[in-house]
C-alpha cells in the first residue's frame, strides 16, 4: 500500500477539493488514464487498479503511477461519544481534480492498453478517459 514514509504532522484538516489539476499531460509513457471527474482515490484503489493493469498486460511494457496518497483520513471507533480528540488515521487518500493523469503505460499496443485501462477504470470511483501522448 502506498503511504508517506514520514510526515511533519500525523493528522490533517479535511480541506476542500477545488481548483485545477497539475500533471494533465502524458509525460512518461505513450498512453494514459485521465480523470474526468473530481474526487479522491484511496491507496487500496490505486493498488487494485495497478494490479488489474499489470495482470492484463502480463508483465510486458511498463506502468507509471502518477498519483500518490499523501492525505491521512481519520475516523473514530464505533460507539464512541463525540469529543475527546480527533480519531486515528485509518487510510490514506489522494485528492484528484479533473484532467489529472492517473496512470501511464508504454511498451504495449494501443488496443491492449485500452483494455488494461478499462479494467483499471472499473476499480476506481472516478469517471476516467483514455488519452495518448501528443507529439509536437
From Swiss-Prot:
* Gene Ontology biological process terms in this record: translation
Question: What keyword terms does UniProt attach to this protein?
Answer: Ribonucleoprotein, Ribosomal protein, RNA-binding, rRNA-binding, tRNA-binding
Q: Which GO terms describe its cellular component?
A: cytosolic large ribosomal subunit
| Top-level taxon | Bacteria
Q: What GO molecular function annotations does the UniProt record carry, in alphabetical order?
A: rRNA binding; structural constituent of ribosome; tRNA binding
Please tell me whether the keyword Lipoprotein is annotated for this protein: no
- Pfam families, alphabetized: Ribosomal_L16 (PF00252)
| Keyword tRNA-binding listed | yes
Q: What does this protein do?
A: Binds 23S rRNA and is also seen to make contacts with the A and possibly P site tRNAs.
Task: Provide the assembly information.
Answer: Part of the 50S ribosomal subunit.
NCBIfam families the record matches = rplP_bact (TIGR01164)
What HAMAP family would the database entry show? Ribosomal_uL16
Task: Return the similarity comment.
Answer: Belongs to the universal ribosomal protein uL16 family.
- Protein name stated in the entry: Large ribosomal subunit protein uL16
* Native source species: Shewanella woodyi (strain ATCC 51908 / MS32)
**What gene, per UniProt, encodes this protein?**
rplP
Amino acid at each position: 500500500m502506498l503511504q508517506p514514509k514520514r510526515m511533519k504532522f500525523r493528522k490533517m484538516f479535511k480541506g476542500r477539493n477545488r481548483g485545477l489539476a497539475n500533471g494533465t499531460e502524458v509525460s512518461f509513457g505513450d498512453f494514459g488514464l485521465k480523470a474526468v471527474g473530481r474526487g479522491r482515490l484511496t491507496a487500496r484503489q490505486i493498488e487494485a487498479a495497478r494490479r488489474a493493469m499489470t495482470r492484463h498486460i502480463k508483465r510486458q511494457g511498463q506502468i507509471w503511477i502518477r498519483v500518490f496518497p499523501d492525505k491521512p483520513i481519520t475516523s473514530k471507533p464505533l460507539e464512541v461519544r463525540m469529543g475527546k480528540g480527533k480519531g486515528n488515521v485509518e487510510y490514506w487518500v489522494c485528492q484528484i481534480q479533473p484532467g489529472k493523469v492517473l496512470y501511464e503505460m508504454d511498451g504495449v499496443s494501443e488496443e491492449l492498453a485500452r483494455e488494461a485501462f478499462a479494467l483499471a477504470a472499473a476499480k476506481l470511483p472516478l469517471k476516467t478517459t483514455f488519452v495518448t501522448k501528443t507529439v509536437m
